[in-house]
Amino acid sequence: MRLLIDTNVLSEASKPAPERRVLEWLHELDEDRVFISAVSIAEIRRGVALMEPGRRRDALASWLSDDLQQRFDQRVIPVDTAVAFAWGDLMASAKRMGRGLASMDGLIGATATTHNLVLATRNTKDFKGLGIELLDPWAD
């Protein structure tokens, strides 16, 4: 199984007291079959940029620019034209279902469908019924 790791799963690993189950799940993954979206990098970077200066901010900035990018090196998927088309369809489907879907979540979901990846996320309810194969590391 090839996976796209959602931002909330990545963020869990950087918390001072992460959920043990999620950390164990992450450590058991076959790294070659795991990808992240450039959108997740943007979301995490925004969070770091909004933090007050200090050790925690410095540590997270280092984790993002050094550890995370090195770990996923050639496995960061950009938003390209195919993802953009899938995003438009996904957002329209969500709207027809009467559901709001955040743009960034939509881009991550579109990345998963475009690249035939299972989306590992805590927010499975946001994507239910939208044709995205889901896995919840907190529950599975």
Identify the residue ranges that each predicted region occupies:
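Acidic, PIN/NYN-like endoribonuclease modules and their adjacent C-terminal/linker elements
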Residues: 1, 107-140
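Active-site phosphate/pyrophosphate-handling residues
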Residues: 8, 21, 82, 106-107, ...
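Phosphate- and divalent-cation-binding pockets in alpha/beta enzyme and binding domains
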Residues: 21, 43, 86, 129-130
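A short acidic, often aromatic-flanked loop/helix-cap motif at beta-alpha or helix-coil junctions
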Residues: 42, 83-85, 140
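Active-site neighborhoods of divalent-metal-dependent phosphate/nucleic-acid chemistry enzymes
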Residues: 46-54, 70-119
